[in-house]
Regions:
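Conserved helix/coil segment N-terminal to the catalytic DExD/H
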Residues: 80-101, 112-118
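N-terminal pre-P-loop "Q-motif" helix
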Residues: 4-21
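Conserved P-loop NTPase motor "coupling/switch" region that bridges the ATPase
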Residues: 101, 118-207
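Conserved helix-turn-beta segment of the N-terminal RecA-like "Helicase ATP-binding" lobe
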Residues: 48-51, 58-79, 149-152
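Walker B catalytic acidic pair
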Residues: 105-107
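Walker A/P-loop
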Residues: 22-42, 131
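Hydrophobic residues on the short alpha-helix immediately C-terminal to a glycine-rich phosphate/catalytic loop
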Residues: 18, 38-46, 145
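Conserved helicase/translocase motor-coupling segment
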Residues: 204-244
Length: 244
């Protein structure tokens, strides 16, 4: 059976934004908005022949396996869905990792120094970062976010980046005698990132009257479903439309 998925309006907009002159895109969408399907749609749009998807939880990765089935990728597309620990072990054993698109799911849990070091060793053409709540360490994990998703940070040096964007406070135990307390101006900072799709913008699109992506509501079934397995998958992935 051939399946066609109708993207939500914000997802279609994200696919368009992936054409920007940037090495990647970050999707800060709330839970249930369809980040998984959107990331796969962008990968398809990029005509990726090899995709690596990583998260640190197997339960989350199992959801990706289910979503991939809906996207009708060509048979010659290789999709690797693995934990960061598995990929780190591959690198330790001397394997070279490469792909067309790297998808890092749940950035807030995937931005440790060890994980970021792994991303540097994965040769790729494009990166997609996903999270509903990306901020950790009071925002300090946005420096590796820039480096990982966009290929560089502004400024590119970590110390200069912190001085530029951070509200620094005195710390007698630090070499520089100061430490990061919080963003100096988060709104200004985030608005200048190369390709960061903010949740506020996504919600505006989702709640627009002309949007086809209203929150999906399932009403009591009055007729027995002809294909209950497909209906269950439809609900799990929170799809707008699935057609033959």
């Amino acid at each position: 059976m051939s399946i066609t998925i109708t993207l939500r309006k914000w997802q279609a907009e994200a696919v368009k934004r992936s054409d920007h002159l940037s090495n990647g895109i970050f999707l800060e969408a709330l839970g249930g908005r369809g980040k998984t399907i959107c990331a796969l749609a962008i990968s398809k749009h990029k005509k990726a022949k090899k995709i690596i998807i990583t998260n640190n939880r197997l339960s989350i990765l199992n959801g990706w396996i289910d979503a991939v089935k809906f996207m009708n990728f060509d048979k010659d597309v290789e999709i690797i869905i693995q934990t960061d620990r598995y990929l780190q072990n591959k690198v330790k054993k001397g394997h070279k990792l490469d792909c067309d698109v790297l998808i890092v799911d749940e950035w807030q849990n995937m931005s440790s120094d060890k994980q970021v070091a792994l991303y540097r060793k994965i040769k790729r053409k494009y990166t997609i970062g996903l999270s509903a709540t990306p901020i950790r360490k009071k925002g300090q994990n946005f420096y590796p976010l820039e480096k990982t998703v966009f290929g560089w940070a502004t400024p590119n040096n970590k110390f200069d980046w912190q001085k530029t964007h951070g509200k620094m406070v005195y710390d007698p135990f630090s070499y520089s005698k100061e430490k990061w307390e919080d963003f100096r101006n988060y709104e200004s900072y985030i608005s200048n990132l190369p390709n960061f799709f903010r949740w506020e913008d996504i919600e505006k699109i989702e709640n627009a009257t002309e949007n086809n992506g209203f929150e999906t509501k399932f009403y009591p079934v009055t007729v027995k479903a002809g294909n209950p397995e497909k209906l269950a998958e439809f609900r799990q992935l929170n799809l707008v439309t699935v057609g033959d």
